[in-house]
From Swiss-Prot:
Main location: cytoplasm
Catalytic activity: Release of an N-terminal pyroglutamyl group from a polypeptide, the second amino acid generally not being Pro
SUPFAM superfamilies attached to this UniProt entry: Pyrrolidone carboxyl peptidase (pyroglutamate aminopeptidase)
One GO CC annotation: cytosol
Subunit-structure text: Homotetramer made of two disulfide-linked dimers.
One term of GO molecular function: pyroglutamyl-peptidase activity
Gene Ontology biological-process annotations: proteolysis
Compartments where found: Cytoplasm
Family: Belongs to the peptidase C15 family.
UniProt protein name: Pyrrolidone-carboxylate peptidase
Taxon lineage: Archaea, Methanobacteriati, Methanobacteriota, Thermococci, Thermococcales
Active-site annotation: E79, C142, H166
EC code(s) of this entry: 3.4.19.3
HAMAP family on file: Pyrrolid_peptidase
Annotated source species: Pyrococcus furiosus (strain ATCC 43587 / DSM 3638 / JCM 8422 / Vc1)
Length: 208
């Protein structure tokens, strides 16, 4: 079995992105009999698609779990659905701000995650990790990557399972925000990393 985990480079003025660390820390490890491949995607429309599709074609993973940062969220959020739309609130890392455009013209309006999202949430709760099912992955790069991965599954037959998980800020990202209005929530990096490992374990159990 092969599992792909993707994260993103920093964006929106942030110096770090915990999902970049997650992808790098999981790259090369084994969970059960599965080999994990971690890759970091650019926060750039077009380029992210190129890197993602090339990675999927090279690795041909059985499972793809894409991870993104969701500033303001206080728990692990497991995304239910990706929609065929881009409506960026902020520019990407090359200054492009795409609004009201489809991700794949003529493709389905939306795809549901093929990960066992309720089982993942239940297992996270058992491990003491706060998590919930989210019904919106936004309309930026996270939804973009989730949609493209599921579209690849639908048209190419792999990965067999694909979905997206959002994580909150980590504490070190909050320091420079203190004294500048309401301090956003955060979660320790170790818990976020463990959450992704749990998601992999549950997905693997579902496929076996």
């Amino acid at each position: 079995m092969k599992v792909l985990v993707t994260g993103f480079e920093p964006f929106g003025g942030e110096k770090i992105n915990p999902t970049e660390r997650i992808a790098k820390d999981l790259d090369g490890i084994k969970i059960g009999d599965a080999q994990v491949f971690g890759r970091v995607l650019p926060v750039v429309f077009g380029k992210a698609k190129e890197v993602l599709e090339k990675t999927l074609e090279e690795i041909k993973p059985d499972i793809a779990i894409h991870v993104g940062l969701a500033p303001g969220r206080s728990a692990i959020s497991i995304e239910r659905i990706a929609v065929n739309a881009i409506d960026a609130r902020i520019p990407d890392n090359e200054g492009k701000k795409i609004e009201d455009e489809p991700i794949v013209p003529g493709a389905p309006t939306a795809y549901f995650s093929t990960l066992p999202i309720k089982k993942i949430m239940k297992k996270l709760h058992e491990r003491g990790i706060p998590a919930y099912i989210s019904n919106s992955a936004g309309l930026y790069l996270c939804n973009y990557v989730m949609y493209l991965s599921l579209h690849h599954s639908a048209t190419k037959g792999y990965p067999k399972m694909s979905g997206f998980i959002h994580v909150p800020y980590i504490p070190e990202q909050i320091i420079d925000k203190i004294g500048k209005g309401q301090v956003p929530p955060s979660m320790c990096y170790e818990m976020e990393l463990e959450a992704v490992k749990v998601a992999i374990e549950v997905a693997l159990e579902e496929l076996l």
